[in-house]
């Protein structure tokens, strides 16, 4: 049944939500109760032109903020010339961006495949690992999120596993190094991640049929609650993979292109992955992703018949935008700015932690920070309910600070403003978060 709604009437809130509820598929929780009509810099604006600080950078993607003038100019320049091509055609923007990434990255990350989303990039990376090793078993952390398509979804263990039937055969998990939850301790009671890693691979070897192809990891598990891998862990993990002939895939959807105070987060750990995937931040809010690997791995995959035809592989317009993103990040020194702004953000969050007992931990790196909200009745566990209350109050007061409310991790806020965020915007966000915490403590103290 067709119905016509004019552009003017759809901005009436009642009409808008009636049409939304009638026409849209819900794809993960409820929609935020705001009608967003434009975005600029670090803010989005509703239909009444109220500014909302965007401390999730859209979907953890808009690292240059919204409507950045260089991105706008790039689109205006390239849109009349080249947008989309047959997947077998190449264009100058694609070759240029691949060359720029190769120049930025260390040896061993030399060749690039351009796609649209992080899940798609991880899917391609997993297929490459299987073709290269001629094996099929893949491993991820128990709080991982790598996408919602077949292979990526099979290796997403944080949430959204039930109700979809069996995962792909050979999909395994090991515990992420979480010092708060792990039972592995040394003689003094300190967390022993090496012992945990050794035991994890002992159990993995027991389950494997001898066909281990790869492990895929984030350097900071974002959906898992902002869990940062400890220093030394990635080196030890890579050694475990090499001993078994496995490839190590690092998924930098959220940490890549400067967010952690380094251009790529794996650089903090002194290793080079076999395959690197980028998405979200590479396009700064536009649909661009990349799979990057060595010449040797690419050649073996090609010789073995690797195929990943997809509609928007090597599209020229997103590639042109990606080059512009890299240009702006380097020109405006945004990697160093993310480090400095991240230190300011972290110090302000720690000040809030000292003031509010509801905050039990502040963790993260650069402009990717996590705030764990504990239950009033059980400080050892993040509180889904209180996290939702605080997040909703922040939105009411003018800040978006959480992407989704997932069961079991709703009490860990992911704070990830654009790299262009100002000191004043950080302080304003802290004021809002302070007010939301004060409200929640007053309303629900002793109840949850």
UniProtKB/Swiss-Prot annotation:
EC number(s) stated in the UniProt entry for this protein: 2.6.-.-
Location (main, coarse): cytoplasm
SUPFAM superfamilies in UniProt: PLP-dependent transferases
Gene Ontology molecular function: any one: transaminase activity
A Pfam family the protein falls into: Aminotran_3
Compartments reported by the entry: Cytoplasm; Mitochondrion
Keywords recorded for this protein, A-Z: Aminotransferase, Cytoplasm, Mitochondrion, Pyridoxal phosphate, Transferase
Enzyme class (EC, first level): transferase
Cellular component, GO, one term: mitochondrion
Record PTM N6-(pyridoxal phosphate)lysine, positions in chain: 280
InterPro entries: Aminotrans_3, Aminotrans_3_PPA_site, PyrdxlP-dep_Trfase, PyrdxlP-dep_Trfase_major, PyrdxlP-dep_Trfase_small
Family: Belongs to the class-III pyridoxal-phosphate-dependent aminotransferase family.
Name of the protein described by the UniProt record: Uncharacterized aminotransferase C1039.07c
Organism: Schizosaccharomyces pombe (strain 972 / ATCC 24843)
